[in-house]
A protein has these predicted regions:
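Short alpha-helical segments used as structural interaction elements across diverse proteins
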Residues: 11-12, 34, 95, 478
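Non-catalytic substrate/cofactor recognition surfaces at enzyme active-site rims
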Residues: 51-692
């Protein structure tokens, strides 16, 4: 199925969608296309789109909200690279949950959340739903709550209900789990309270020079028709759902496929990476105070699409992004480029209300019809096995352990694993996993990895979102979009595939890419035919949606939530100030005036930050003498790091004073000290710095 022609909107400056009076230009631009008439906003669930008028905006009741969900910034294992030594030591950017609730007035409702974290897990999804139902009854449930991870690799982990992931963070982290769940629930509650008549619009823009295909040899195994869609191996399309209310843009959800692996595994300071920076910058330009997200006038969620084989490291080695060796600058550049992609051609929407189908599927044993397989023969998936190429990690982005000698297929693979497979792997497993050098049979040990996954299909005012727990490659995402568009009889332009939602199932490559056995193929855990299985599942959901019939939703499989031992690392005991000092006292600071542009560092007698994560208040601020705040611990100009020796903790705040006007500035540090009895005592310290 091919994309249909869509109306174009005039080129709009980026700030046109970023709040303030300029946002009126956005609605005017849509109106200028002649397509801004009212669509059919309240179709019954199951209604098709036949007979509705295509519009560039569709009426919909929408609410948006955001909340702080920052996890433990000291001593917590980070989630993404599986490097045990990568434990949090500071905070460059707070983590946020950004939620949108869509309601069609006819019983159709969807909550869509983007969370600044490495991976999403069933444990988080189900706990969020339990808490929402305690407040809202059955308004929110497994079928209408989508929680996606941004996939940053520099945020605390230890929040999975499956053992393998939590092993990489040396155990479960209850404090970070609670921070994550509480933040997501609060964001949805705020979005629910914000529900009001709005309009939604969809644009497709282009993101230039953000990402490179890190497994080009595998990509090139695909048929020419697939490769022709992505000449450089990357999907440059940026898809944005804009929310407009009373003539002003009040939020957006953007989908673009790129890995947030700008920061390598040696980096231990919490950051949202390129997607987190794009979201912060959009909101900052719109006047959002990130210490008070409850009052945010604009919410910008930069979600994932299908980035499985797309790296931000343009030199195809770690730390080779556009910042020329500066990881943070690379994240900023790539974030700005994604923000630049939020405008583009308006996509005509067929209108309609909200419709949804979801299904829990045991991925160990999906029977696949021949029409979905490369050779036309029926096939099956199998219990999860991770290959040697997975253990090698993506050698373009980092992770893995070189001393173990594992390699991706493009680098020769791992011959000794192949030899072991010949005698140790059952023929049935070998048939399913094919070219994979089978290393870790994680699916044969209960509780190690999630194997029953939920697949969601939602239609919101003509926009179709297919979400799943996997990391699809670029072409895998394309094939799923094609199948869904054909089954629903809608243009491909309105179909979005989003990974990292409601769980984690590792990768999905095409069967052709799988044969290469690069990292992505080694991490396609259910076998060579995982993509045909997922495509068949989505085809079934789409067919049911088009016909207006329900599906058997199935049920999640139990996990080990509450049974995985907590991590012993970074847990606060008692805090002790240095001899002769009080908590908050300045230990070191610049002597005399500093030139604008200087990185100003002030060290304080601190406390373990894990005792009090200071959500929506913050650990630091930089203020003018009149109290006007110029930066906080979400701002791009600041970073706070903690160094703990025995019971003493030093907190060092670094402020980039670039652009600061001459004058005096106060750098404030806030924390809470834990006493012998476990009680917390808040404290504050400050240092005045003169910028010459």
């Amino acid at each position: 199925m091919t994309d249909t022609a869509t109306a174009r909107i005039p080129s709009i400056p980026r700030r046109a969608f970023l709040g303030g009076s300029a946002t009126a230009a956005a609605l005017g631009a849509f109106a200028a296309t002649g397509l801004a008439r009212q669509g059919t906003a309240h179709a019954r669930p199951g209604d098709g789109e036949a007979g509705t008028s295509a519009s560039s905006t569709v009426p919909m009741t929408v609410g948006r909200g955001m909340a702080d969900m920052t996890g433990e910034p000291l001593g917590a294992g980070m989630n993404g690279y599986a490097v045990l030594e990568q434990q949090t030591s500071g905070l460059r950017q707070r983590q946020f949950a950004r939620a949108f609730v869509f309601d069609d007035g006819n019983g159709g409702r969807v909550a869509h959340v983007t969370a600044d974290m490495g991976l999403m897990f069933q444990s988080i999804q189900l706990e969020v739903i339990r808490r929402l139902q305690a407040r809202f009854g059955d308004t929110y449930h497994e079928g209408n709550v989508l929680i996606g991870a941004s996939h940053t690799h520099v945020a605390p982990g230890g929040t999975s209900g499956h053992l393998m992931v939590d092993l990489t963070t040396l155990g479960f982290r209850p404090v970070t789990f609670e921070a994550t769940v509480t933040g997501i629930v609060l964001a949805i509650e705020r979005a629910d309270a914000d529900l009001a008549p709005s309009q939604i619009a969809l644009t497709r823009g282009t993101v230039a020079d953000a990402g490179i295909n890190r497994s080009r040899g595998a990509f090139d195994r695909n048929p020419d028709a697939d490769k022709a869609v992505f000449p450089d191996g990357v999907d440059r399309d940026s898809v944005t759902l804009h929310v407009i209310r009373d003539g002003a843009a009040i939020g957006l959800i953007n989908w673009y496929g790129i890995h947030p692996t700008t920061f390598g595994p040696e980096h231990t300071i919490i950051s949202g990476d390129n997607k987190g920076y794009a979201a912060w910058l959009a909101e900052h330009k719109a006047g959002v105070d990130h210490t008070n997200p409850a009052e945010a006038p604009y919410v910008a969620a930069f979600a994932m699409s299908a980035p499985g084989d797309v790296s931000p490291n343009h030199g195809l080695v770690p730390n080779s992004g556009p910042g020329e060796g500066n990881e943070y600058e690379s994240a900023r550049i790539l974030g700005r480029r994604q923000l630049d992609g939020i405008t583009g051609r308006a996509i005509a929407l067929g209108g309609g209300g909200i419709d949804a189908r979801h299904q829990w599927v045991n991925m160990r044993e999906v029977k696949i019809e021949g029409r979905w397989t490369p050779d036309g023969q029926p096939g099956t998936t199998g219990p999860a096995i991770l290959g040697a190429a997975f253990a090698a990690s993506s050698q373009e982005d980092g992770g893995g352990e070189p001393m173990l000698g594992f390699n991706e297929g493009s680098r020769g693979g791992t011959p000794w694993v192949r030899q072991v497979n010949q005698v140790a792997v059952p023929a049935s497993a070998s048939a399913i996993h094919g070219a994979k050098e089978n290393l870790l049979p994680v699916g044969y040990i209960p509780g190690l990895v999630q194997q029953t996954h939920v697949f969601h299909l939602h239609r919101i005012g003509g926009i179709v979102i297919a979400s799943l727990a996997f990391e699809p490659t670029v072409v895998a995402g394309l094939r799923m979009r094609r199948a869904i568009a054909e089954a629903l009889d809608v243009p491909m332009d309105v179909v979005i595939v989003q990974g990292y939602v409601s769980g984690y199932g590792h990768y999905i490559t095409t069967p052709e890419e799988y044969e290469q056995q690069d990292y992505e193929g080694g991490a396609t855990i259910f076998g060579r035919l995982t993509l045909p299985a997922a495509t068949q599942i989505f085809d079934g959901l789409a067919a049911a949606m088009r016909s207006g019939v329900p599906v058997d939703a199935g049920a999640p499989e139990g996990d080990l939530t509450g049974k995985i031992p907590p991590s012993p690392m970074g847990n606060p005991l008692v805090d002790v100030a240095p001899l002769g000092k009080n908590f908050g006292d300045v230990l070191s600071a610049p002597e005399g005036p500093v030139a604008a542009g200087t990185a100003v560092a002030v060290a304080f007698a601190g406390a373990n930050p894990n005792s009090d994560l200071r959500h929506e208040t913050g650990f630091l601020s930089v203020e003018k003498q009149d109290g006007t705040r110029v930066a906080d611990d979400s701002h791009e100009a600041t970073v706070i790091e903690w160094n703990k020796e025995a019971a003493q903790t030093t907190a060092t705040i670094t402020w980039d004073s670039s652009g600061a006007a001459p004058g005096e500035y106060v750098i404030r540090y806030r924390g809470s000290a834990r006493g012998i009895g476990g009680g917390l005592t808040p404290f504050e310290g400050s240092s005045t710095v003169t910028v010459a």
